């Protein structure tokens, strides 16, 4: 309220508080302490006395922290962060309703003691939890004020705190840990506190009164965040040895329990942070750690982006990475030795020396990249080491994932190559991949790989690759050469040494899997083991004596198209030996509709002969031009880019697929012919 003071010039007013004191009188009563040491020498003068502490120490950050006298408290110990006891036994208290202040605990302006101060506050908070016998309803936030222009603070060791405490930086800061060669630098982990915190303390106050025996543990939520900026941790890198192995072993951010621990790490997340130069950017705990993640993050110049490093227990449910980048890894984007269900949304991956997702031999982990960008992966998009159990790993690349399959430089090869890997093993297909991503950048790329298949050579049979029909925006390729999961219309893709000499000419025969129809002086015969390459597959040997020669190589496995609009795709692996001119390949379909019945009046036998209605030819490929453009020498196999064919007869009884080879002279060696519908 305001009142007129008649002792002052006319019209003057002064403020009056509810207790009758004027504002000036209140200002006159305000007390200041330059340091906490000075505060401890100030005795309260009244039951509602307040004071302001400018700094914790002479060289600490300016905080101007308000404290109040609590006349009812005569027992609380001086904790150095929120309770300060005078010589006369009075308790000055800092109101912690917004959390504890690292500045009031002595954080220096240059941040050189940030490790000591933050870990000290954490230990005092834990002591309060232990004294109270509970985590719930305890203040668990540590506010860390950042001052100055472009602050760069020196870390003297890791920051370590349990998952029920939150670190909140106020302002952007660079935490320089380049002198640290080991350890988990941002270590949100319950294991170091198991000697003090117990399940009973974590669970106190969480259970309904009618079920006192049930255990619900406290959760932490925002374990690391930044208001008004971001936190950057810079570490010394990996410093590879002569065998290309890292000599420095740091983890940028540890989220969860890294050893056996009954204290839950649940529902916690890091946000607004960068990790630069660690061996592992982010490690997720493998013991009682679940529903944890990171948001608005960047991991750069590390050995591995993030990891699940061991097979623990009760962990990995609904882990997530959102709105971030994993870039310039020496090795893998995700290194998953343990389990866990990891979902990536709006995450970009730029340049990896190894694999996008790499699984250990026992890993049952799930890697689900639902949206974002993938670029520059030198290794596989997904790879699993030789499986040692029935532990199937799962990878899902979503429709909103755009890939650029180049490796490093702008002009790098981005065409078809092996993208998924799991070796043949006693347990079956232990890497399952559902790939809905798209890679328009590889259109028009000349193949420099022998196998037109994203699972690579036929021996890579531990992969089950599923390519949903409605997701392609670029040329599709066959999903696998493995007969157990291949989506082709022909189950037979090769022949054995029992097949020798020229191929038979009866496309309707069921005695053999392949047949050839020849126009002109060409020949088509089975290859021999001596003509096989290291994969063991023998080729068909096609010799053209004149550019007008035509060879139709058919697989006699019959199929029936689903509709007249179905598009059949085909590809194979080809090498040219001593050819001239342009060797042209195209997929074809021979359609059969109706039957001619022939009766033998002598024997009474009746023969049924399907009527061929025509051969439809699909898109062509000039393999000679392709080999020249790709620098592929004679005798080296090259993938035929997939081409489609359409136009078979509606309602046809059956069809057979094949390739047409024509256009030049010389020898064409063709192996692994495959045809499939999307």
UniProtKB/Swiss-Prot annotation:
One of its GO terms (cellular component) is virus tail. It is found in: Virion. Keywords: Degradation of host capsule during virus entry, Degradation of host cell envelope components during virus entry, Host-virus interaction, Viral attachment to host adhesion receptor, Viral attachment to host cell, Viral tail protein, Virion, Virus entry into host cell. It comes from the Viruses. The keyword Transcription regulation does not apply. In the N-terminal section; belongs to the Przondovirus depolymerase 2 family. Functions as a receptor binding protein (RBP) and probably mediates the attachment to the host capsular exopolysaccharides. Displays a depolymerase activity that specifically degrades the K56-type polysaccharides of Klebsiella pneumoniae capsule, which allows the phage to reach the host cell membrane and bind the entry receptor. This is Depolymerase 2, capsule K56-specific. It comes from Klebsiella phage KN3-1. The lineage of its organism: Viruses, Duplodnaviria, Heunggongvirae, Uroviricota, Caudoviricetes.
